[in-house]
């Protein structure tokens, strides 16, 4: 899981197929090791539970997208399409009112829960109430808390009344598009409970998705069975088995001996080894996520734009991608994904240490005898914080040390356990850091005010960077005053350019999702979403 915060997103991946050797075919032309219509998946982690309202684990997002359903999803090209809703609400189709405060969702009439009960508007209303219920340990209420009330005039109509206009709502209300994936829960089973934090449902879920929960042998495997009554059609797979394998190298070996058909989380360091496996197809799926270097602008030195610019020019981004990401990452140009209406193809930050030194010279930062620059009694002496559980985090921090030293800055490294560095009492959320490196998901909608706005410093929002850019704020706020995509796009293009030029954060690389699979797997593609498995009912093997 990544903070945010982490939308994982991918267009249908182009396969990069490794060398193959001739094998005796099994039934239907399959390889001998393929089990017809049974997909074996592996991951090094195990879910904490299955409740889509309570977890922030990427694996839970994946599993829940098979068991539960959403109102709106994205296809493999990033286009929004209806799932439980028959269409995406827009101004043009009347789903969004002219004042932007009323949203109407029309629901499918052919959906049943795995226990046979009908799915209705009451389920949507109940799940929203569960999200905003303070007794539930729900994270990421952003968007849901903008709703004043929900009406259900009939079983298949849901009407949202917002407290005020909020254009990102469609991309955040029961969608799998970004961090905080939330599927719809069954009201007939859960309504009336004080909370849903510790209930049997969380380990034996009932959903409306293409596969239904069968069993969970903790520490070993999870079995999902085909939902014969799935509303989009009978799934082609009979069974999906999730195998819990404790480490990445063991997963690689399981793929090598063909005990596993699909791995969607192999680390970049093993990417070349996966590509070298015979009879295994390997792809790189674009993913709406970034690794970023954040700068605490509450520190006087980092509040200086010249210092932030110099840091951005001291970094060799291509070397990070080739040496640390093993070619899996790509150069970033914006802090929103390419599918977003606000995406702006900014020039990438350039690697130019000489220019970085010149910028600092011009701003009055002069080298001391030890080579570290100083000005008015302040030194460019920093500490970078990273997660002790992230191999890439340590590698990046180590990579940055000589890079910053070359332009007159000192950088020490401090590693924290994952649950400490991202705790609300940890160094990031208490602004007790200089620099930090981590990965996050990019929001599908270009609205970033909650993360970078002047009024949203934590705990009022998720601005843990000390950023306050008046021009950026003005443009972001204007983008929330209209639901017209064309008008919003113009405003967010300006906002993205302003943020880029002010070096609010430094994106180091865009992530891509390595995927390794049995070449007998058919119709598999990933979507630009935190829960990327948008068409699992069509998969077959």
Regions found by a protein language model. Give the residues of each.
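Extracellular/periplasmic solute-recognition and catalytic clefts
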Residues: 22, 131, 149-150, 214-225, ...
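Surface-exposed binding/hinge segments that line
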Residues: 141-191
């Amino acid at each position: 899981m990544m903070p945010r915060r982490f939308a994982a997103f991918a267009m249908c991946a182009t396969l990069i197929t490794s060398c193959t050797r001739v094998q005796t075919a099994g039934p239907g032309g399959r390889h001998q090791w393929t089990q017809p219509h049974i997909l074996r998946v592996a991951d090094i982690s195990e879910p904490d539970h299955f409740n889509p309202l309570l977890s922030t684990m990427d694996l839970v997002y994946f599993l829940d997208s098979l068991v539960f359903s959403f109102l709106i999803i994205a296809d493999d090209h990033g286009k929004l399409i209806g799932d439980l809703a028959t269409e995406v609400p827009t101004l043009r189709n009347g789903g969004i009112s002219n004042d932007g405060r009323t949203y109407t969702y029309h629901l499918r009439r052919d959906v049943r829960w795995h226990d046979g009960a009908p799915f209705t508007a009451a389920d949507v209303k109940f799940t929203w109430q569960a999200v905003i219920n303070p007794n539930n340990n729900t994270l990421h209420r952003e968007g849901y808390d903008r709703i004043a009330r929900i009406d259900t005039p009939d079983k298949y109509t849901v009407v949202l009344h917002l407290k005020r206009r909020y254009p990102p709502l469609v991309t955040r209300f029961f969608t799998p598009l970004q961090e905080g994936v939330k599927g719809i829960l069954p009201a007939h089973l859960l309504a009336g409970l004080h909370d849903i934090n510790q209930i049997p449902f969380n380990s034996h879920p009932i959903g409306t998705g293409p596969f239904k929960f069968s069993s969970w042998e903790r520490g070993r495997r999870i079995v999902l069975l085909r939902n014969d009554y799935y509303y989009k059609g009978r799934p082609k797979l009979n069974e999906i088995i999730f195998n819990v394998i404790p480490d990445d190298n063991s997963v690689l070996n399981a793929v090598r001996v063909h005990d596993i058909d699909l791995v969607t989380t192999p680390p970049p360091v093993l990417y070349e080894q996966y590509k070298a496996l015979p009879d295994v197809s390997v792809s790189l799926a674009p993913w709406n996520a970034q690794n970023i270097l954040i700068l605490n602008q509450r520190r006087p030195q980092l509040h200086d734009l010249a210092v932030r610019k110099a840091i951005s020019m001291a970094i060799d981004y291509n070397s990070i991608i080739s040496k640390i990401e093993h070619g899996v990452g790509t150069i970033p140009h914006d802090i929103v994904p390419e599918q977003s209406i606000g995406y702006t193809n900014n020039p990438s930050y350039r690697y130019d240490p000489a220019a970085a030194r010149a910028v600092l010279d011009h701003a009055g930062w002069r080298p001391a005898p030890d080579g570290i620059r100083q000005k008015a009694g302040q030194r460019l002496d920093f500490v970078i914080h990273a997660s002790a559980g992230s191999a890439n985090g340590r590698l990046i921090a180590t990579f940055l040390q000589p890079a910053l030293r070359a332009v007159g800055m000192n950088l020490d490294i401090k590693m924290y356990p994952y649950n400490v560095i991202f705790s609300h009492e940890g160094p990031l959320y208490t602004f007790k850091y200089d620099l930090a490196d981590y990965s996050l998901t990019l929001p599908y909608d270009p609205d970033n005010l909650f993360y970078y706005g002047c009024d949203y410093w934590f705990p009022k929002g998720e601005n843990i960077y000390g950023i306050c850019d008046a021009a950026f704020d003005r443009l972001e706020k204007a983008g929330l005053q209209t639901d017209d995509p064309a008008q919003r796009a113009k405003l967010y293009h300006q906002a993205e350019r302003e943020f880029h030029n002010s070096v609010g954060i430094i994106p180091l690389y865009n992530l891509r999702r390595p995927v390794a699979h049995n070449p007998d797997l058919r119709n598999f593609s990933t979507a630009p979403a935190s829960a990327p498995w948008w068409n699992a009912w069509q998969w077959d093997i």
